[in-house]
């Protein structure tokens, strides 16, 4: 049974189809990639999974339990966390405070006995931001801001982690660090779903990849299978390689 199971999800805005019978599954202990051209529906799918957008049809389940009708905070209690394509940090707070807010909220609604301050400190070390822990996030470069947002998601101890273009703005060193962290999270049993335009990162870190085009899943397979799929080459990878 997949940790996350999205089945036949469609989203329509009037006559516009954002998702068309899209399905996606993510297993515990795996990094699942979700790629496709701009406007393919990747963020829309994340919004459906997290409860920010109701589907026109279809269903979402975690560990076999249907969560389609649950609001976002109840989905979070089921172990779901995400980052956003645009940074959504508390701009008046420091790195430490941003993560501590999430850790404290998690303890309150989960009855977790771990001290939020201790968890926050451990996460700061894990994402490599000890030197800037007490700096306001507005002073950080974008790549480090992405790490703060990841740290805030980790404060909620997710079993399903959705990452929307988390490597955007990162330099090569930060991307390498990020890739190692994703693999560590998978090895700890987290189901990671990665939306990312950095094709090299996706191919290096993902166990399986799904490809969206015009709201439909056109391919699913291992990185090697995706790289040789004619439909994917036509719709996405060929264009991506040509733009590098």
Predicted regions mapped to residue ranges:
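Glycine-rich phosphate-binding loops of nucleotide-dependent enzymes
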Residues: 2-244
């Amino acid at each position: 049974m997949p940790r996350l199971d999205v089945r036949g999800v469609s989203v329509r805005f009037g006559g516009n189809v954002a998702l068309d019978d899209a399905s996606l599954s993510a297993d515990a202990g795996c990094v699942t990639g979700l790629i496709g051209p701009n406007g393919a529906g990747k963020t829309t799918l994340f919004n459906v999974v997290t409860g920010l957008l109701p589907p026109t049809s279809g269903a979402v389940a975690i560990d076999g339990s249907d969560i389609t009708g649950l609001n976002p905070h109840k989905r979070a209690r089921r172990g779901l966390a995400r980052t956003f394509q645009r940074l959504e940090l508390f701009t008046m707070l420091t790195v430490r405070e941003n993560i501590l807010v999430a850790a404290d909220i998690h303890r309150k609604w989960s009855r977790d006995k771990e001290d939020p301050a201790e968890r926050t400190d451990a996460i700061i070390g894990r994402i490599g931001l000890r030197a800037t822990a007490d700096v306001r996030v507005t002073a950080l470069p974008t790549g480090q801001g992405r790490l703060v947002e990841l740290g805030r998601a980790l404060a909620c101890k997710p079993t399903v982690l959705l990452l929307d273009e988390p490597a955007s703005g990162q330099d090569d060193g930060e991307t390498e660090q990020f890739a190692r962290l994703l693999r560590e999270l998978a090895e700890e049993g987290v189901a990671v779903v990665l939306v990312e335009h950095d094709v090299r990162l996706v191919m290096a870190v993902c166990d399986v990849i799904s490809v969206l085009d015009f709201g439909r899943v056109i391919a699913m397979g291992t990185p090697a299978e995706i790289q040789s799929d004619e439909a994917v080459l036509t719709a996405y990878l060929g264009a991506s390689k040509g733009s590098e």
